Structure formats: C-alpha cells, structure tokens
Amino acid sequence: MKTFLFLFAVLFFWSQPRMHFFFFDEKCSRINGRCTASCLKNEELVALCWKNLKCCVTVQSCGRSKGNQSDEGSGHMGTRG
C-alpha cells in the first residue's frame, strides 16, 4: 500500500510541471509561432516557451502586396529623401 501511495505521489507531482510547460507551448502555437533556441533573421521574439526557448513568429513584410496596384504609374519611387 505504501508503494502504491509513493508511486501515486511521484506521478502526480511529476505531471504538474509538464502541464504548466504545455501552457507556454500552446500559447506560442496559438499565435502561429515556434519554440526554438534562437529566432531567425526574418522572425521576431514574441513570447517565451519552456526550458528557456523563445517563441518566434515570422515577420510580415510591410511592402505592398501583388494585388494592390493602386499607386502603380503614379511616378512615386517609394524612397525617402
């Protein structure tokens, strides 16, 4: 009986930290991020994951999309002077 109680206590307390860490990974995946040791050049750090990993999300470019051609032919070069 003591062995059963001991194993139950060990398994119960062992599962608690793992559930806590799962929360961080779930939060990162909800924002389409990935947990990794370091972010790439085209990624930004948006949150922290477990075991000192970083939640990195790909940076969206702020340039005009292919479908947006409203300023084409206006003579504007798009550079700052």
UniProtKB/Swiss-Prot annotation:
One GO CC term, this protein: extracellular region
Biased composition range(s): Polar residues: 62-72
Residue segments, region Disordered: 62-81
InterPro entries: Beta_defensin_dom
Annotated tissue distribution: Only expressed in epididymis (caput, corpus and cauda).
Tagged with keyword DNA-binding: no
Signal peptide: 1-20
Entry superkingdom: Eukaryota
Disulfide cysteine pairs (residue numbers): C28-C55, C35-C49, C39-C56
Gene Ontology biological-process annotations: defense response to bacterium; innate immune response
Keyword DNA repair on entry: no
Annotated compartments: Secreted
Keywords: Antibiotic, Antimicrobial, Defensin, Disulfide bond, Secreted, Signal
Coiled-coil segments: none
Family classification: Belongs to the beta-defensin family.
Record function comment: Has antibacterial activity.
The protein's name in its UniProt record: Beta-defensin 34
